[in-house]
Regions:
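Conserved cytosolic headpiece of P-type ATPases
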Residues: 1-241
């Protein structure tokens, strides 16, 4: 009996440690999103060591070794099933949207190809890459019909409308801009509000799995795979389900 109680205690302790770790990851993700959202574009490029034309091919290859592929491998089938069920409960959000977000897609990316001899004279290349190959610092282009492939910071937006119902349950389209707090014309979030600020309210950030309803945008990839906002939430939900 004592052995059984000890086992239960150890299990509870391990679950508690895991829960704390997940909460820490969620907080780090939130802090990163807020920091990137409130920086100016030049500062964002400096943070990710990228340029307006994107990463070099060589650097992108290095980063995929560091960050891994942009995909969610754990409990993927269960997540897909839950999303499909939710899609039937949310008006206007079709199962096709969910399928589009889960299937292998490609996205338009700009990268720089340098001379193999000198490493200089970079040539800008526009290419369609599988979303799994995206890394932080990549420059991507979004337009109507696209599923957002990663957490991204918008640097240019043209009448951009996004459906975030997969995260919020609210089917109303949300307009996104180049600047955080565009409507209030503020650049920085007050420190006293920072702790409890909801990342989903950031007006210049789009989240992995959300859907472009209208307009177009250019954006920098902030987080990929399990490190995205939805990726961390999926991890938490998978543990509790």
């Amino acid at each position: 009996m004592l052995y059984a109680n000890k086992t239960v205690g150890n299990t509870s302790y391990k679950l508690s440690k895991k829960s704390m770790k997940e909460q820490t990851l969620l907080q780090k993700n939130k802090d990163l999103l807020i920091e990137i959202a409130t920086r100016d574009v030049k500062s964002v490029f400096a943070y990710f060591k990228t340029t307006r034309d994107g990463l070099s091919m060589k650097e992108a290859q290095k980063r995929i070794q560091v960050y891994g592929r942009n995909e969610l491998t754990s409990k993927r089938a269960r997540i897909a099933e839950v999303m499909m069920k939710l899609s039937g409960m949310i008006p206007g959000f079709s199962k096709q949207h969910v399928r589009n977000g889960l299937q292998c897609e490609k996205i338009t990316v700009s990268r720089v190809e340098c001379s193999s001899v000198t490493g200089l004279n970079g040539e800008l290349k526009m290419m369609n890459l599988p979303v799994q190959e995206l890394v932080p610092g990549d420059m991507i282009f979004l337009s109507e019909g696209d599923t957002v492939p990663a957490d991204v910071r918008i640097i240019y937006a043209n009448d951009l409308l996004v459906n975030e119902s997969v995260l919020t349950g609210n089917d109303a389209s949300v307009e996104k801009f180049e600047s955080c707090y565009h409507l209030e014309r503020k650049r920085f979030i007050p420190l006293k509000r920072m702790k409890d600020y909801n990342p989903l309210e950031l007006e210049n950030v789009c989240f992995k799995g959300t859907y472009i309803v209208g307009g177009n945008a250019k954006a920098v990839v902030v987080s990929t795979g399990k490190n995205t906002y939805s990726g961390i939430l999926h991890t938490c939900c998978s543990r509790t389900s």
